[in-house]
A protein has these predicted regions:
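Phosphate-binding P-loop
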Residues: 1
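Conserved beta-strand elements of the Class I
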Residues: 5, 30-34, 130
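Glycine-rich phosphate-binding P-loop
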Residues: 5-22
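N-terminal phosphate/diphosphate-binding loop that engages ATP/GTP or pyrophosphate donors
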Residues: 21-90
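Active-site rim loops that border cofactor/substrate pockets in soluble metabolic enzymes
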Residues: 60, 83-108
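Conserved catalytic-core segment of NTP-binding enzymes
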Residues: 104-111, 116-198
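Short, hydrophobic alpha-helical segments
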Residues: 196-208
Length: 208
């Protein structure tokens, strides 16, 4: 099997659309899709809503999406054609607790695509794509930590010639890496899908 990870430096920059786009354009891989969400204090991992609970049973939740029309990101993955879609929620810094369940689900998958940066602490994917948007100043620590591990960079099309202004981020880490421009609404191109398809095919041939 192949594992593809899609990450990025902030929220709302197209990561979920990239995952859904790859699922839709490469249906032959029968993807199991994972959405990994880490919440800070004051949010419940059971449903992602604000809460005051601090009990141990609210530090981790894993659920499989059953509906294609619920409006969630995991529903988008199913609607795009994923064989299965799984939502993992943990408290910030506690993803390790979810790894036994994640590895179990990976063992059942034909191929997997995971929306996350932090998962790279615990596994080495066959392909890691990072999404960058020069118009968004926020830069997650997890994205900064793993920027040099990206196999390709998906650059969100900038308006008005925006120049990145990210603190403590060295773009030298991605010099020489393949770059693809993506844009709304689907944040996917034939070139990106082809790159992923070729990479997986190469992985599968080496694994034989």
């Amino acid at each position: 099997m192949a594992i593809v990870v899609v990450g990025g430096h902030s929220r709302n920059i197209g990561k979920t659309s990239v995952v859904a786009g790859l699922i839709g354009r490469l249906p032959q891989f029968h993807w199991t899709a994972f959405k990994i969400t880490q919440y800070g204090h004051g949010f419940c991992t059971a449903n992602g809503e604000p809460c005051d609970c601090q009990t141990d049973d609210h530090t981790l939740a894993v659920s499989e999406e059953r509906s294609r029309t619920s409006g969630t990101d995991t529903a988008r993955f199913l609607a795009a054609g994923a064989a299965r879609s799984i939502w993992v929620r943990t408290r910030v810094g506690m993803l390790a607790e979810a790894m036994p369940r994640i590895r179990k689900e990976l063992g059942l998958a034909e191929n997997a695509i995971i929306e996350s940066n932090s998962i790279l602490q615990f596994l080495k994917p066959d392909l890691y794509l990072t999404v960058l948007d020069a118009g968004t100043a926020d830069f997650k620590d997890s994205a900064r930590l793993f920027l040099d591990r990206a196999d390709a960079v998906l650059v969100r099309a900038a308006e008005n010639g925006l120049v990145p202004r990210w603190d403590r981020v060295s773009l030298k880490l991605i010099e020489g890496k393949p770059r693809f421009v993506i844009a709304s609404p689907d944040y996917m191109t034939d070139e990106v899908a082809g790159f992923v398809e070729q990479h997986i095919a190469r992985h599968c041939s080496l694994a034989k």
